Curated annotation (Swiss-Prot):
Stretches assigned to the S4 RNA-binding domain: 98-166
Quaternary organization: Part of the 30S ribosomal subunit. Contacts protein S5. The interaction surface between S4 and S5 is involved in control of translational fidelity.
Role played: One of the primary rRNA binding proteins, it binds directly to 16S rRNA where it nucleates assembly of the body of the 30S subunit.
Superkingdom of origin organism: Bacteria
Protein name, entry field: Small ribosomal subunit protein uS4
Keywords (A to Z) from UniProt: Ribonucleoprotein, Ribosomal protein, RNA-binding, rRNA-binding
Keyword Magnesium appears in the UniProt entry: no
């Protein structure tokens, strides 16, 4: 399955909540979900009743789109999570949240996960002082993430950092905005991650 390249705001409207795919726009009244809180298309405003399978599929699609992960990789993450000793939904969130592109986004060095993925793949991000250009790289507690010195002056990075200064820092991260550096202190707990997705329905879908 190829990566989606169409208008990302339509994805948020289809799910019925913000996936935070458009960067700073998602935090303003210009957000498509705020302006047009119904699904795209001719019959988008009509009420549609989904089957149980349909609801499970919607939950999976929403989580995949939020983190920018394709089906094959998402299934692998689910298999990893299902082998953990803790509850599968919680483990799945920890796996997704520890992706390097997501950590760069959570630290406020990029305005969206897509932009964070580009920063990583183009070699602008260091992990413990070494360049890592794999967006799916799994960050571990204690790892130090920073933007390369030459890349700190890039306009998208500077704009993202300035916009993030007034937002609440995730409790599992320590961030130095002036240095464009942060520490992944620990894995987040499920209740600390604001994701309006029914994780249990995803577990049921993959358990069939």
């Amino acid at each position: 399955m190829a990566r989606y390249t169409g208008p990302v705001c339509k994805l948020c409207r289809r799910e019925g909540f913000k996936l935070y795919l458009k960067g700073e726009r998602c935090f303003t009244p210009k957000c498509a979900v705020v302006k047009r809180p119904f699904a795209p298309g001719q019959h988008g405003s009509a009420t549609r009743k989904l089957t149980q399978y349909g609801m499970q599929l919607r939950s999976k699609q929403a989580l995949k789109r939020m983190y920018g992960v394709l089906e094959k990789q998402f299934r692998r993450y689910f298999e990893i999570a299902s082998r953990k000793s803790e509850e599968t939904g919680t483990a799945l969130i920890k796996v997704l949240e520890s992706r390097l592109d997501n950590v760069v986004y959570r630290m406020g060095f990029a305005s969206s996960r897509k932009q964070a993925r580009q920063l990583v793949s183009h070699g602008h991000v260091l992990v413990n002082g070494r360049k890592v250009n794999k967006a799916s790289y799994s960050v571990r507690p204690g790892d130090i993430i920073e933007i390369k010195e030459k890349s700190k002056a890039k306009v998208p990075v500077k704009e993202a950092i300035e916009a993030s200064r007034n937002r609440t820092t995730p409790p599992w991260l320590e961030i130095d905005f002036d240095a464009a550096r942060g520490t992944f202190v620990r894995f987040p707990e499920r209740e600390e991650v604001d994701i309006p997705v029914d994780l249990q329905s995803i577990i049921e879908l993959y358990s069939k």
